[in-house]
Amino acid sequence: MANLKTKYQQEVAPALQKQFNYKNVMMIPRLEKIVINVGLGEAVQNAKALDAAVADIAAIAGQRPVITRAKKSISSFKIRTGMPIGCKVTLRGERMWDFLEKLIYVALPRVRDFRGVSPKSFDGRGNYALGLKEQLLFPEIDYDKVDKIRGMDVIIVTTAKTDEEAKALLKGLGMPFAER
């Protein structure tokens, strides 16, 4: 299923090298990793919510997520240091390419009233962040087994130095950016 990787190697990388006049092939921006994060405020009261989120993310990513814990105690949120408050998974290599392909060609087209992802979500260092409102966008999630709709953050980390280079990379891979 790594068609996206071959597309990158055969089409996107040479096009980027030409567009930005890179002298060395190692200067061409490439994907480093994709981080999927789910923050769960309700995990404080409901421990089963965390297990369900972990199972969902494991199904989507094909890799077991790590549970994230609170760094500080915050009394207004009723959390203490070390309490589980979410989960995240870092994808690299083949799994990263598989997930990106699934995100671009399956999950994003399923979003209601989808007009493209925001071109403003770059962080200034060539990384792209994107929020999804529900886990049902992915085909691995069975609608009948979902206890609660949860969103997730997807962070695409690239080796690009600027946002312009990162946008050209993602656009070349088929990321549907919204036109202003």
From Swiss-Prot:
It comes from the Bacteria. GO terms for molecular function: rRNA binding; structural constituent of ribosome; tRNA binding. It comes from Symbiobacterium thermophilum (strain DSM 24528 / JCM 14929 / IAM 14863 / T). PANTHER family: 60S RIBOSOMAL PROTEIN L11-RELATED. The keyword Protein biosynthesis does not apply. It holds the Pfam family Ribosomal_L5. Part of the 50S ribosomal subunit; part of the 5S rRNA/L5/L18/L25 subcomplex. Contacts the 5S rRNA and the P site tRNA. Forms a bridge to the 30S subunit in the 70S ribosome. This is one of the proteins that bind and probably mediate the attachment of the 5S RNA into the large ribosomal subunit, where it forms part of the central protuberance. In the 70S ribosome it contacts protein S13 of the 30S subunit (bridge B1b), connecting the 2 subunits; this bridge is implicated in subunit movement. Contacts the P site tRNA; the 5S rRNA and some of its associated proteins might help stabilize positioning of ribosome-bound tRNAs. InterPro entries: Ribosomal_uL5, Ribosomal_uL5_bac-type, Ribosomal_uL5_C, Ribosomal_uL5_CS, Ribosomal_uL5_dom_sf, Ribosomal_uL5_N. Belongs to the universal ribosomal protein uL5 family. GO terms for biological process: translation. This is Large ribosomal subunit protein uL5. GO terms for cellular component: ribonucleoprotein complex; ribosome. Keywords: Ribonucleoprotein, Ribosomal protein, RNA-binding, rRNA-binding, tRNA-binding. PROSITE patterns: RIBOSOMAL_L5 (PS00358). The keyword Hydrolase does not apply.
